């Protein structure tokens, strides 16, 4: 079930990886470009305003890191003009985008997504509405494009325990105070894992 915080004027939502899969599939039924847009936000942590722009020319494999990185020009959380960062792309998303570019006959500099920011946001709302209707799950109606980045940050910082400096770099945050509002409480699975590990370490002393 989608986790929500409706204690503030703007409801915040956090999707699990499985729920993100559902959203991608729902969006993909209305067009491959929609699915790609959601992958870039939910799997790579892009803001809705950053989705249109990146292309094959921006994607590179880092031999040092053994990972895919791609250049994103986006918000500067310190203020001022936009800045470029290297965002991380999971292998599965890179594979999908290579296939997408081939089948769409995209040139290296052709953006994967050409839709406006408002259109990208609408795609998320439409896919979430489809799931809410099909599953009789009203919480999905509150899901927005920003919640995909929120879910991405929580999944890696809270659930996977990725270090903050790494997340600041690939997510485009200038300091931890800019990330903290994105985070949700750990899931029960994460709490259980943490407490079991702590208990095991205590017993071994």
Positions of the model-derived regions?
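DNA breakage-rejoining catalytic core of tyrosine-based enzymes
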Residues: 1-22, 79-91, 106-107
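Basic, Lys/Arg- and aromatic-enriched nucleic-acid-binding interface segment
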Residues: 2, 13-47, 200-201
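Phosphate-coordinating loops and pocket residues in cytosolic domains that bind phosphorylated ligands
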Residues: 25, 53-54, 61, 181-184
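Short, basic (Lys/Arg/His-rich) helix/loop patches that form interaction surfaces
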Residues: 29-30, 125-169, 176, 188
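A short, glycine-centered helix-capping/turn motif at helix boundaries
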Residues: 40-54, 159-162
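Conserved tyrosine-mediated DNA breakage-rejoining catalytic core shared by Y-recombinases
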Residues: 53-96
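Active-site/catalytic core of tyrosine-dependent DNA strand-transfer enzymes
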Residues: 90-140
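Catalytic-site neighborhood detector that most strongly recognizes the C-terminal catalytic loop/helix
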Residues: 171-196
């Amino acid at each position: 079930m989608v986790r929500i915080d409706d204690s503030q004027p703007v409801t915040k939502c956090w999707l699990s990886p499985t729920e993100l899969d559902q959203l991608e599939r729902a969006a993909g039924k209305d067009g491959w470009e929609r699915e790609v847009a959601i992958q870039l936000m939910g799997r790579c942590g892009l803001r809705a305003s950053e989705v249109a722009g990146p292309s094959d020319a921006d994607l590179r494999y880092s031999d040092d890191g053994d990972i895919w990185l791609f250049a994103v020009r986006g918000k500067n959380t310190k203020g001022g003009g936009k800045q470029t960062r290297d965002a991380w792309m999971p292998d599965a998303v890179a594979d999908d985008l290579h296939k997408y570019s081939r089948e769409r006959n995209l040139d290296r500099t052709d953006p994967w997504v050409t839709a406006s920011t408002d259109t990208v946001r609408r795609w998320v709302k439409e896919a979430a509405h489809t799931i809410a209707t099909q599953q009789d799950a009203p919480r999905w109606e509150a899901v927005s494009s920003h919640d995909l980045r929120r879910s991405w940050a929580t999944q890696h910082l809270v659930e996977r325990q990725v270090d903050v400096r790494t997340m600041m770099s690939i997510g485009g945050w200038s300091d931890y105070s800019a990330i903290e509002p994105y985070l949700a409480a750990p899931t029960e699975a994460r709490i259980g894992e943490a407490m079991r590990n702590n208990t095991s370490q205590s017993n071994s002393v």
